[in-house]
Amino acid sequence: MLQPKRTKFRKVHKGRNRGIAGGTEVSFGSFGLKAIGRGRLTARQIEAARRAMSRAVKRQGKIWIRVFPDKPITEKPLEVRMGKGKGNVEYWVALIQPGKVLYEMDGVSEEVARNAFALAAAKLPFKTTFVTKTVM
């Protein structure tokens, strides 16, 4: 599972997920999976989608993960009264804005890449689209 090795602070405020995304172009591979929706992507979802893609391409080609879960999410245990401080860190998320390229792939045909990204998209909590590298 992906998570930071060290952080400056153990817990962070909830914050808001507004604004426009960086990393909107396919820069490493030939094909990419781009987010259309906005949301939080957990480390487990990132890993599940990666596994689905790598199985679909039968371990050929190369896959790049363009997102990293760097925000800790805390939860209080069941049946605990309110108050008494912030809960414990339970999992890590990456905040995703529309237009962000989540995964990239190279070394496979477009048909195989489309199929692999379709399997990966089923594991994600927002809508995505298939994109190709634009050559200037």
UniProtKB/Swiss-Prot annotation:
One of its GO terms (molecular function) is structural constituent of ribosome. Part of the 50S ribosomal subunit. PROSITE patterns: RIBOSOMAL_L16_1 (PS00586), RIBOSOMAL_L16_2 (PS00701). Keywords: Ribonucleoprotein, Ribosomal protein, RNA-binding, rRNA-binding, tRNA-binding. One of its GO terms (cellular component) is cytosolic large ribosomal subunit. This is Large ribosomal subunit protein uL16. One of its GO terms (biological process) is translation. Belongs to the universal ribosomal protein uL16 family. It holds the Pfam family Ribosomal_L16.
